[in-house]
Amino acid sequence: MSKKPAALIILDGFGLRNETVGNAVALAKKPNFDRYWNQYPHQTLTASGEAVGLPEGQMGNSEVGHLNIGAGRIVYQSLTRVNVAIREGEFERNQTFLDAISNAKENNKALHLFGLLSDGGVHSHINHLFALLKLAKKEGLTKVYIHGFLDGRDVGPQTAKTYINQLNDQIKEIGVGEIASISGRYYSMDRDKRWDRVEKAYRAMAYGEGPSYRSALDVVDDSYANGIYDEFVIPSVITKENGEPVAKIQDGDSVIFYNFRPDRAIQISNTFTNKDFRDFDRGENYPKNLYFVCLTHFSETVDGYVAFKPINLDNTVGEVLSQHGLKQLRIAETEKYPHVTFFMSGGREAEFPGEERILINSPKVATYDLKPEMSAYEVKDALVKEIEADKHDAIILNFANPDMVGHSGMVEPTIKAIEAVDECLGEVVDAILAKGGHAIITADHGNADILITESGEPHTAHTTNPVPVIVTKEGITLREGGILGDLAPTLLDLLGVEKPKEMTGTSLIQK
């Protein structure tokens, strides 16, 4: 019996905008895409910012896009998750934070807050520190100390004073907190097992050892005078009038490490929490029994509490298809294979029962502008064969070209990439339609739609432009205002499968 497959076709990096200059999507001849756009119901989807769980205005990417598509819901990335928690009041009700504060209050101990002191948004955000200071004040703490790690990488190399001034203003306004130590991230956030660096940061925080200054701004001024900028500032101790350190991390104190990205938070956390730590000698009087809180899950090796626990993505599209006994195919070339498999399945490597995967090797060229068609024709040939063999109920396909060639910032090769994809798209969709099936044609984020900056330079990054969605089924209407998280419910809708409660996205097909 002939299967009537429903396919989700992702044209990676295929964004939409009206302006044609530097817009390979608009400049390319794409008769098949245009035919489907004109013949079938279509809309645009938001694929950036909070609609995909990123901060407002931030461009999407392939990992985030495929996570949202497969999950059928907005998957909040750590930064946005914490921002939303602050905005909606969940942050100050977070039990892990409250327990750390109770430990300090009930045992007359200090609360130490440490993390990267910037608004770079890659490892941390200074607003999260301010929210912790407000919470500490609200809960009546007085002994609150900040150990600031200077950035200079995710923000400008000499911006530390801006952030220290912001922090000093907040301390004054909120009425709690003192800066106890300052160190460049080169020391406190090493991830390459350069323990001599980590030890310097540790000794400043735990023992009050290192160069000493009366204020954080003095540390920076002195460093700059010696040609040492933010990232590389030597771990330094802030002292009181009598020359004693403002604070040292001591036995039984509470610590909240407000970085959200794990990789550069693990080593310094292990130094404070791991009973079997052997990478350098912490000394006899190292602080023990700390109530140590990580903002997110850093590592199994870190012996601490986690404020924002990992979100397990249950009932992604692949799992739901499998539960209903439907056969599914995931197909892409090497560059986007992890996206249609691992990310589409919510971070799961293993196949679901009834899932088949086809990997087509990407061409071995230095850069893809040298071969803009990449392996699109091979992907198409393999898929058409599968469709004709009536094996699959659902197909998830990615064409990598608009994104991978778009990253070159070169208009002509990207036009060629899109024209190759359009040719393949026509054969694939027509094969599906010939079987009585349906296709959803869409994208995960923009890229090929802006290849030239306003100043005429090559534009190699993703864009925040909307992406298309076409459903090749006549007699239906698609609603406006859709997001990537609505695609899985739409695919299930085409297959007559009810979406699970975990999928908070809704089908784009109007009822």
Swiss-Prot record:
Protein name: 2,3-bisphosphoglycerate-independent phosphoglycerate mutase
GO cellular component: cytosol
Cofactor note: Binds 2 manganese ions per subunit.
Stored Pfam families: iPGM_N (PF06415), Metalloenzyme (PF01676)
Gene this protein is translated from: gpmI
Annotated source species: Bacillus subtilis (strain 168)
Keyword Isomerase part of the UniProt annotation: yes
Quaternary structure note: Monomer.
Name of the top EC class for this enzyme: isomerase
Catalytic site: 62
EC number: 5.4.2.12
